[in-house]
Amino acid sequence: MILYVNCCARENSRTDILAREVIRRIGDSEVEEINLYEKNLKPMDRQSVAKRDSLAAAGNFSDPMFDYAKQFMASDTIVIGAPFWDYSFPSLLKTYIENVFCVGLISVYDENGVPHGTCKAKKLYYVSTAGGPFIPDYSYEWIRAVVTRSFGIPETKLIYAENLDIVGHNPDEILEKATASITL
C-alpha cells in the first residue's frame, strides 16, 4: 500500500500533479491519501504531549491519537507531496510529523540510545515544486533525516521542479521535464 501524504493547499497544485505521477509510476493499486488540509491536525501541546507520553509508557496505543503513526508504519511506500514555500515546506507537514512520531511505537531506542524505526516502508519519495530555486537543506534533508534515522525507512528519493515562477521561464515545460526525468 502506498501512503500519499498530500500537503498541497492549492487546487491544481503543481506539486500534487508531480506527486500523483510518481504514484502512478510506482504502480501499486492500493493508495491511501491523507490530505493534511482536510484534517484537523494540531501541533503537539502540553496536554497532548503528556497524554502521548503517558499512554506510550503504558504501552497503550489504542487511542485515536496514534492512528496517523499506525497508518504511516503500515505503509509499504510513502509519497510526501509538499511545495517549497518561504524556504521550507508548509508548517502543516511538521505538525503531521509531530503527530506521527511516537517513541515506543514508530521508533524505539536501544540501550545505547540509538533509535530504531519500526516502519514497514522501504522507500519514501519526497515530491516538491518551487517558484524559485529549490533548497533541499531546508525541507527534504530534514524529512530524510527523520525517516531514515528514527523511523527506519532505509531509502528516500527527492523529486522536484524549481524556478516555476521565474519571469521568462515556461512552467509547463519545466514540469514536463521534471515528470520525464522521474526515476524510481
Where are these regions (language model features)?
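Residues at the starts of beta-strands that form the adenosine-phosphate
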Residues: 1, 30, 122-124, 155
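N-terminal beta1-alpha1-beta2 submodule of the flavodoxin-like/Rossmannoid cofactor-binding fold
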Residues: 1-98, 102, 180-184
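Structural beta-sheet core signal
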Residues: 4, 80, 124-126, 158
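Short histidine/acidic/glycine/proline-rich micro-motifs that form metal-
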Residues: 8-12, 131-134, 164-166
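Active-site donor-binding loop signature of nucleotide-sugar glycosyltransferases
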Residues: 36, 129, 161-163
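Structured loop/turn residues at beta-strand edges in well-structured enzyme cores
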Residues: 73, 91, 119, 151-154
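Short, glycine-/small-residue-rich phosphate/pyrophosphate-handling segment
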Residues: 109-151
